[in-house]
C-alpha cells in the first residue's frame, strides 16, 4: 500500500512539475508556468528558413523556396549557392535581432521552418533553432515552432514549397514523414519551457473550390501529428490551424487534446469585431485558447486598429513578418543590394530550359551576380537594416 501511494505521489509530482514549468492551455486562455494568464505578442521570423519571393522584391519571378534556390544555383553555381545559403541563414537572424525583438516589448517569436531541415541526417535545423531558442531564453521570449512546409505540401502554393498541390492529404508516406519529423522535434524540445508550442501545419488547404474536398481530411491528419508529438512530449501545447489559409474553423470537431490551442490568420479585411467573431465564439464554445498566428502586410493605421481589436478580445498574436526587403510593413527592413535589378529582371523571364541560349544572353555577369548576393548577405544583417518606427508603434511596441 505504501509503495502504491509513493508511486501515485511521484506521478502527481511529475504532472505538477510539467504543468508548473510550461506554458499551457487552461480553459479558454493560455497561462504561463505559474498559472498566470499569458497573452502572446510577437512577430514571425519569415524568410529565414523558408524564403518567399515577394520579400526579396522578385516581382514576376520565383516565389517558392525551391524556385528561389534554383535561381541562385543558375546565377552563381551550385557550390557558391550552397555556401551562400549557409551564410544567409547565419546572417538573417542573429543575436541582435532577438535582442531587438525583446527590447521592443514583444514576448514571442514564431519560427516558420521547412521540414527538410529536420529529416534524419540533417542537423542544421536543430543547430539553427537551438541557437535562437537559447537567445530567446536569455531575453525571456517564448518560441513557437511552425511547420511552414510539410512533406507533400499542406497548402499547394508557394508558401509550402510544394509542387502546386496539397499532396499531404493524398499521400500516406508524406503524412508519415510529417509525423516522424514532429516526433523528432518533440523529442528534442520536450523538456524546454522556452519553446511554448508546436504549430503543426501552416495555412492548410487554400480557398480554391477544387481543393476544399480536403477539408474533411485535415483533422484526421492533425490527429496523426498530435499522436506523434504526444509519444515524446506531454508538456507542450499543440497548435491547430483551420482550413483555407488558417481561417476556417468549421472543419474542427470538439477538441481532442487537453493541451491544444487553435490558430487563425487574417489579412486584408476591415479590422472590426466581425473579423474575429467566429474565433471568439469557437473559444467560448469549446473553452480553448485561440491565437492569431499571422496578419499584417498593411498600413500602420490598419495594423494598429487590428492589434487593438485583438488586445480588446484578449487574443494572442504574432504579426507577419519581422524583416523583408524595402518595405514599411515589418518591424525591420533592409535595402536592395547592388545589381539586384539585374537579378530581378533575369528571374522574371521564366524561360526554363527550353531556350537556354536566350537565357544565357539575358543573365547578369557572374561578377555582378556574385556581388549582388554578397551584398545581400551584408544588407540583411540587423546592424545594416532599418527599423520601421511607425510599424512598431502600431503594434504597441517600444521605439528607441
Q: Where do the protein language model's features map onto the residues?
A:
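Short amphipathic alpha-helical segments that mediate assembly, nucleic-acid/protein binding
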Residues: 3, 65-69, 81, 369-373, ...
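Aromatic-rich peripheral "rim/lid" segments of glycoside hydrolase catalytic domains that contact
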Residues: 302-400
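Sec/Tat signal peptide C-region and signal peptidase I cleavage site
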Residues: 14-18
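Sec-dependent N-terminal signal peptides
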Residues: 3-12
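Extracellular glycoside hydrolase catalytic/binding regions
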Residues: 22-23, 176-325, 329-345
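Active-site mouth of glycoside hydrolases
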Residues: 25-40, 45-237, 242-250
Amino acid at each position: 500500500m505504501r509503495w502504491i501511494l509513493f508511486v501515485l505521489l511521484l506521478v502527481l509530482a511529475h504532472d505538477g512539475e510539467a504543468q508548473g514549468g510550461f506554458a499551457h492551455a487552461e480553459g479558454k486562455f493560455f497561462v504561463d508556468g505559474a498559472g498566470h494568464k499569458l497573452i502572446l505578442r510577437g512577430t514571425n521570423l519569415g524568410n529565414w528558413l523558408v524564403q518567399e519571393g515577394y520579400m526579396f522584391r522578385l516581382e514576376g519571378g520565383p516565389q517558392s523556396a525551391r524556385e528561389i534556390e534554383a535561381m541562385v544555383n543558375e546565377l552563381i553555381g551550385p557550390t557558391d549557392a550552397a555556401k551562400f545559403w549557409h551564410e544567409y541563414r547565419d546572417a538573417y537572424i542573429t543575436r541582435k535581432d532577438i535582442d531587438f525583438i525583446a527590447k521592443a516589448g514583444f514576448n514571442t517569436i514564431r519560427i516558420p521552418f521547412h521540414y527538410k531541415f529536420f529529416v534524419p541526417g540533417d542537423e542544421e535545423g536543430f543547430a539553427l533553432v537551438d541557437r535562437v531558442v537559447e537567445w530567446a531564453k536569455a531575453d525571456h521570449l517564448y518560441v513557437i515552432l511552425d511547420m511552414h512546409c510539410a512533406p507533400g505540401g499542406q497548402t499547394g502554393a508557394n508558401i509550402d514549397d510544394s509542387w502546386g498541390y496539397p499532396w499531404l492529404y493524398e499521400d500516406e508516406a508524406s503524412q508519415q514523414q510529417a509525423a516522424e519529423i514532429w516526433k523528432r522535434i518533440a523529442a528534442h524540445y520536450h523538456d524546454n519551457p522556452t519553446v511554448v508550442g508546436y504549430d503543426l501545419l501552416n495555412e492548410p488547404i487554400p480557398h480554391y473550390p477544387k481543393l476544399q474536398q480536403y477539408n474533411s481530411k485535415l483533422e484526421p491528419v492533425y490527429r496523426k501529428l498530435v499522436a506523434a508529438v504526444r509519444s515524446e512530449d506531454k508538456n507542450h501545447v499543440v497548435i491547430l490551424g483551420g482550413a483555407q489559409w488558417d481561417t476556417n474553423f468549421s472543419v474542427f470537431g470538439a477538441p481532442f487534446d487537453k493541451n491544444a490551442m487553435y490558430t487563425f490568420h487574417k489579412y486584408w479585411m476591415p479590422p472590426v469585431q466581425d473579423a474575429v467573431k467566429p474565433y471568439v465564439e469557437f473559444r467560448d464554445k469549446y473553452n480553448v485558447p485561440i491565437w492569431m498566428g499571422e496578419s499584417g502586410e498593411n498600413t500602420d493605421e490598419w495594423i494598429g486598429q487590428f492589434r487593438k481589436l485583438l488586445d480588446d478580445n484578449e487574443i494572442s498574436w504574432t504579426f507577419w513578418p519581422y524583416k523583408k526587403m524595402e518595405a514599411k510593413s515589418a518591424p525591420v527592413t533592409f535595402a536592395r543590394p547592388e545589381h539586384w535589378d539585374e537579378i530581378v529582371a533575369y528571374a522574371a523571364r521564366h524561360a526554363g530550359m527550353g531556350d537556354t541560349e536566350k537565357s544565357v544572353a539575358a543573365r547578369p555577369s557572374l561578377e555582378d551576380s556574385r556581388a549582388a548576393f554578397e551584398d545581400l548577405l551584408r544588407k540583411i544583417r540587423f546592424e545594416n537594416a532599418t527599423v520601421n518606427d511607425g510599424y512598431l508603434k502600431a503594434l504597441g511596441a517600444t521605439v528607441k
